[in-house]
UniProtKB/Swiss-Prot annotation:
<keyword id="KW-0548">Nucleotidyltransferase</keyword>
<dbReference type="GO" id="GO:0001000">
    <property type="term" value="F:bacterial-type RNA polymerase core enzyme binding"/>
</dbReference>
<dbReference type="InterPro" id="IPR006110">
    <property type="entry name" value="Pol_omega/Rpo6/RPB6"/>
</dbReference>
<protein>
    <recommendedName>
        <fullName>DNA-directed RNA polymerase subunit omega</fullName>
        <ecNumber>2.7.7.6</ecNumber>
    </recommendedName>
</protein>
<comment type="function">
    <text>Promotes RNA polymerase assembly. Latches the N- and C-terminal regions of the beta' subunit thereby facilitating its interaction with the beta and alpha subunits.</text>
</comment>
<comment type="similarity">
    <text>Belongs to the RNA polymerase subunit omega family.</text>
</comment>
<keyword id="KW-0804">Transcription</keyword>
<dbReference type="InterPro" id="IPR003716">
    <property type="entry name" value="DNA-dir_RNA_pol_omega"/>
</dbReference>
<keyword id="KW-0808">Transferase</keyword>
<dbReference type="GO" id="GO:0003677">
    <property type="term" value="F:DNA binding"/>
</dbReference>
<dbReference type="GO" id="GO:0003899">
    <property type="term" value="F:DNA-directed RNA polymerase activity"/>
</dbReference>
<comment type="subunit">
    <text>The RNAP catalytic core consists of 2 alpha, 1 beta, 1 beta' and 1 omega subunit. When a sigma factor is associated with the core the holoenzyme is formed, which can initiate transcription.</text>
</comment>
<dbReference type="Pfam" id="PF01192">
    <property type="entry name" value="RNA_pol_Rpb6"/>
</dbReference>
<dbReference type="GO" id="GO:0000345">
    <property type="term" value="C:cytosolic DNA-directed RNA polymerase complex"/>
</dbReference>
<dbReference type="InterPro" id="IPR036161">
    <property type="entry name" value="RPB6/omega-like_sf"/>
</dbReference>
<dbReference type="GO" id="GO:0006352">
    <property type="term" value="P:DNA-templated transcription initiation"/>
</dbReference>
<keyword id="KW-0240">DNA-directed RNA polymerase</keyword>
Length: 99
């Protein structure tokens, strides 16, 4: 991202630390399947979720501390999703063993 974009992002938070935490949390949400607020043409340019999270914040469509997904709900959803993935892998392994 350009330096002017970083400066804009820093103005949204009270510290560089908070900006990095918010960006990391949003990148994790995106990784776990949370929908992006960016138009499709902007999402296609990068597969880097940290950059995508920073772009989302820079557009103003996400506001720090207000409309990011609730952290507890996000964690519960992530755990359920991961458990389902592991169960599917286990079932596939059991199926292969039967063959």
């Amino acid at each position: 991202m350009a330096e002017k974009d970083i400066d804009k992002l820093l103005s949204l938070t009270d510290s560089k630390y908070r900006l990095s935490v918010v960006t990391a949390k949003r990148a994790l949400q995106l990784r776990s399947g949370a929908p992006s607020v960016l138009p499709v043409e902007q999402r296609v340019r990068t597969h880097n979720l940290v950059t995508q999270a920073m772009r989302e914040l820079a557009t103003g469509q996400l506001t720090v501390g207000t409309n990011l997904i609730d952290e507890q709900r996000f964690h519960q959803d992530y755990v359920r999703q991961r458990q389902a993935q592991l169960q599917a892998q286990l079932n596939a392994e059991r199926e292969r063993e039967r063959d």
